Amino acid sequence: MALKRVFLLRSVAPRVAALSTKPQAQEQPPASPEALRGCGAAKAVRPPVPAVDFTNTQEAYRSRRSWELVRNLLVLRLCASPVLLAHHEQLFQVARKLLGQRMFERLMKMTFYGHFVAGEDQESIRPLIRHNKAFGVGFILDYGVEEDLSPEEAERKEMESCTSEAERDGSGANKREKQYQVHPAFGDRRDGVISARTYFYANEAKCDNYMENLLQCIKASGGASDGGFSAIKLTALGRPQFLLQFSDVLTRWRRFFHQMAAEQGQAGRAAVDTKLEVAVLQDSIAKMGIASRAEIEGWFTPETLGVSGTVDLLDWNSLIDSRTRLSRHLVVPNVQTGQLEPLLSRFTEEEEQQMKRMLQRMDVLAKKAKEAGVRLMIDAEQSYFQPAISRLTLEMQRRFNVDKPFIFNTFQCYLKDAYDNVTLDMELARREGWCFGAKLVRGAYMAQERVRAAEIGYEDPINPTYEATNAMYHRCLNYVLEELKHSTKAEVMVASHNEDTVHFTLCRMKEIGLHPADGQVCFGQLLGMCDQISFPLGQAGFPVYKYVPYGPVMEVLPYLSRRALENSSIMKGAQRERQLLWQELRRRLRTGSLFHHPA
């Protein structure tokens, strides 16, 4: 079965007893001055944490020359103009024709490109990285080049790459759940998305090219500084059909578990707290005709159950990989028809090879990142890809996060199931003893996700309101912070431009007793946005990172378009940033420090 290939990435971890959902206190080894930061680090006595003031413009912009502040103001003001934004692509084209490419590129470097992009190649980005590092701000390196496709071309590529051979010839039509079926109305995944890069599958050679670019990005991260990050998207590494099919498998298998939980009177419980009685579960599966009682008893052994004697969702999920010989039994009941349906789809030989190469590319990147001492951040994507992306990331974490978290998963807190996803992954890391690495974001695909769910006809996966998303973000973050109070085997990045969320994090860190020097909590913002948050944090000793894209001017124009649109979509934050920039320029004029030189 083709999906077994997924788990070649995994090195089997020893099974220990199931734990509760609450982080449990653990005895820590004595602290030593030489202790490394992060996973496995011992916590030593630390100096007091300086107060962080996001209104002190002198400190916030200490790293910037006055002309840079003027450029920032100009760019942010242009991003606030609805007329300019509505026609910015046409304006770019006109400017390029009038000025010529050379002068156009120079103009872009003086404005939008210079504000949002670090440079054209690995050498040209080094001065900015060194400069920011001197003021306490690290980097997440990202090769920002994208294909500039027409909507029609993007739709054609998406339909071809997300449809299996069986679906094309009619034998596999409509087998997947609605959410995981490709739909022509949403073939252009860029539509309605303003803050995330999008890749479209062309062929295996193109995926190899992306991998080589990412390897160069990892090399640059390792050479530029210690402790850097690189970011990757799994849709750049292979045919998205596999991600859709695997996501469908994982979702249906999880839903089957919750159906049986409801039969045992456990409907509505948190996912990590739902535990099924083994004997009742075995009876239910046998009555459905999935397998004989004798076969089923072989599934649930002390090795898989620990000492709990019950089956939770983590035990249940493990059947797909650790018990792959049971693949012929992986069927689930169709609620509408009452019939048993196979869970795993059939792949052609070519499709299986494409999937295998995708997994190999992931493996190559993870190995290279670990060798270079670079942490690899797996970006989140659309909800119909995300179950597969999260599971593949988890398999990489099991293998590479033994001593410290090199692989970070991204959790989108606008999803209704975000808290379940965070708690389940954290629990699995505890049980198996590997290091948990997470980036928490609100999410980049909200408008597209809502429209798609309504149009195709499945439950909206997004929280109903912005306030509900904020509450979910803080709930997930608080859970991870409570874990950090007792364990050094986890790290979290608070990737947010929301000042209230950053304040919440700082307050909880102080209450819990987490020191910034321990390096377990870090912050992330985009280059060119929210310097008034990033630099005060960095100068106070908190680990903070800028998401730093690079690439040739003409090839990062799609990225620049999204940055302009994103600034317009978060007007409250951008307006505050403009006010602070004006305030600092007036202060410099008033005090005679207009020619301020950062030092």
Swiss-Prot record:
The Swiss-Prot or TrEMBL record lists the needed cofactor(s) as: FAD
- Basic and acidic residues: compositionally biased ranges: 153-180
Mind telling me which InterPro entries this protein's record contains? Answer: FAD-linked_oxidoreductase-like, Proline_DH_dom, Proline_oxidase
Biological process (GO), any one: proline catabolic process to glutamate
Residues annotated with N6-acetyllysine modification: 356, 367, 485
Q: Which SUPFAM superfamilies match?
A: FAD-linked oxidoreductase
GO terms under cellular component: mitochondrial inner membrane; mitochondrial matrix; mitochondrion
Q: Where in the cell is it found?
A: Mitochondrion matrix
- Tell me which UniProt keywords the record has, alphabetically: Acetylation, FAD, Flavoprotein, Mitochondrion, Oxidoreductase, Proline metabolism, Transit peptide
Q: Does the UniProt entry include the keyword Mitochondrion?
A: yes
Gene Ontology terms, MF aspect:
amino acid binding; FAD binding; proline dehydrogenase activity
Presence of keyword Mitochondrion: yes
Q: Which pathway, per its entry? A: Amino-acid degradation; L-proline degradation into L-glutamate; L-glutamate from L-proline: step 1/2
Q: Which reaction does it catalyse?
A: L-proline + a quinone = (S)-1-pyrroline-5-carboxylate + a quinol + H(+)
Linked pathology is: Pro/re mice that have a premature termination on Prodh are sluggish in their movement.
Instruction: Tell me which family the UniProt entry assigns to this protein.
Output: Belongs to the proline oxidase family.
Q: What does this protein do?
A: Converts proline to delta-1-pyrroline-5-carboxylate.
Task: Spell out the protein name for this chain.
Answer: Proline dehydrogenase 1, mitochondrial
Species, as recorded: Mus musculus
Give the encoding gene's name.
Prodh
